[in-house]
């Protein structure tokens, strides 16, 4: 699972601030969160099961690129998070911020959302940051998240999680391309599209690995 941020929400322009999004990232204690929900902590998107070379039984996480993409303490860095939060708030001219996180009404997602509701204000300061929660059925939540294309203010924060093909890990990144029709978040990047297309359709895509 990862936190989904609606960066084009006109009512909360700070969501488009890179430093603020980094503050949220570095402000998540993934080890304690995973322990609470009986899951494995991860600060990365590509899971440990995705293969890069079947002949050698090498997963992406086994490669030098996969290892180089890891962060100490699963990315949790409270001091860095607080610094980035303060800088973002100053840049946006804000003294206090209230955000709402939408989540599906299951026990697991409630636990995860409540964890952030408690930990982020404790880290950033309860007098400066508040996280409200809004539970709803999964189908309704999907509609809300995908509604950003016609209603930019459809949501602020939510959760996302995609299933990929272990034998073609690169294909899972289609969810973040500009042309994927069921995008949950307004991430659009021309360079990302080019890399995705090269990995999936270029003539030399099988020169290394699988």
Language model region names:
Residues 1, 138, 155-172:
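Ligand-binding clamshell of periplasmic/extracellular solute-binding protein-like
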Residues 1-48, 70, 95-107, 204-210:
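Alpha-helical secondary-structure segments
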Residues 18, 78-100:
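Immediate post-signal peptide segment of exported/extracytoplasmic ligand-binding proteins
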Residues 34-37, 69-75, 129-142, 169-210:
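Extracytoplasmic/peripheral linker and loop segments enriched in polar/acidic and small residues
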Residues 41-87, 106-110, 205-209:
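Structural transition elements
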Residues 94-100, 121-137:
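A local structural motif
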Residues 103-118:
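Bilobed "Venus flytrap"/periplasmic-binding protein-like clamshell domains
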Residues 114-125, 139-155:
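Short helices/loops that flank or line small-molecule/ion binding pockets
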């Amino acid at each position: 699972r990862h936190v989904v941020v609606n960066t084009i929400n006109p009512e909360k322009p700070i969501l488009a601030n890179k430093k603020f999004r980094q503050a949220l990232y570095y402000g998540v204690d993934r080890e304690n969160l995973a322990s609470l929900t009986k899951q494995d902590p991860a600060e990365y998107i590509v899971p440990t099961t995705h293969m890069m070379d079947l002949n050698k039984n090498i997963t992406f996480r086994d490669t030098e690129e996969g290892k180089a993409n890891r962060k100490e303490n699963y990315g949790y860095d409270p001091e860095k998070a607080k610094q980035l939060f303060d800088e973002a708030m100053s840049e946006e001219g804000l003294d206090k911020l209230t955000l709402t996180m939408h989540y599906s009404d299951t026990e697991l997602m409630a636990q995860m959302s409540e964890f952030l509701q408690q930990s982020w204000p404790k880290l950033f300061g309860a007098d400066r940051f508040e996280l409200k929660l809004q539970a709803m059925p999964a189908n309704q939540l999907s509609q809300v998240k995908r509604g950003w294309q016609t209603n930019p203010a459809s949501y602020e924060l939510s959760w996302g999680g995609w299933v990929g093909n272990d034998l073609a890990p690169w294909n899972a990144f289609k969810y973040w391309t500009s042309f994927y029709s069921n995008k949950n978040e307004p991430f659009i990047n021309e360079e990302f599209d080019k890399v995705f297309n090269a990995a999936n359709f270029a003539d030399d895509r099988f020169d290394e690995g699988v």
